[in-house]
Amino acid sequence: MRDGQPLWTCTGCGRTFANRNQTHSCAPLGSVDAHFAGCGPAVRETFDAVLAAVRACGPVDVLPERTRIALHVRMSFAAFMPRRRWLDGHLVLARRIDSPRFRRVEIYSPRNVLHAFRLMVPGEVDAEFTAYLAEAYLVGAQEHLRRGPGTR
């Protein structure tokens, strides 16, 4: 990746991407609030705690898509699917982490590893989880492409 390479903007939906003509579901974005209709208050509070932790890392775009809420810098690095009593989601990290915090790990490439999780209450957005969010934020900013695989 070249430093400062401009993002490509889709003329159909207005989303930005690191790669020109990036394949995506070109659809208008919805609202964050609509994703939480029918959810318990702890679900929204948990998402808000996650979002506050991510915003402490830097600017982030919140993309309320049809089936998920994605967090995006140069690329999407996290996604959330609110359920009635919990918040399902995943982070994209530049390395595999074997932790009971993650329900599933899928390796897409050596520097793009999906880690699925389920959060029940805002208190689970603790120092450990916040560190994972910060690491995922760097992936979203594509900082992981400036370093070797598996390094922070």
Regions found by a protein language model. Name each.
Residues M1-R152:
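Charge-dense, helix-prone N-terminal extensions
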